[in-house]
């Protein structure tokens, strides 16, 4: 028991060192409560997942209803202009806009999202298509697929989420999240890569993801 516990503590320590140094000029790592004085609950970051084996690892927490149609024709809107990964914005026949990330890490991002969700961490809807049909100025043709993230009216992006200063710094779910990112070799922990969403439920209540 003791050797295993020692190993776990070492992993957490390495994670903390890695996290503290991932950005040269990053702010101090500390708990940071909302300026408006609103109460923060741990379940805004993590909830007990219950029976992990029952989780949908194909379509994720938002299910098949929010997934992109692999048989639809997607109309080109614009190319991705931020970041190093290739991609584009497209719109499907239902009028839903999709952010398509076509880099090699696209399917990895979806896989990580499924694992995090299965372990109780909130995740926005993301999906993967190996290819899709695109309509652009070249006509209608097959296009390389990637990570598909929908722009839905019930999900409002309200800003970046800071790794260094948030209400969950120091909690076990937060530390476990860092350890899992180390296991996935996810070193690109820029705050600009993490969006905070407000989800409006059907009953009118809201939650942050």
Which residues fall in each region the model found?
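Short, solvent-exposed loop/turn and secondary-structure capping segments
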Residues: 58-64, 111-113, 192-197
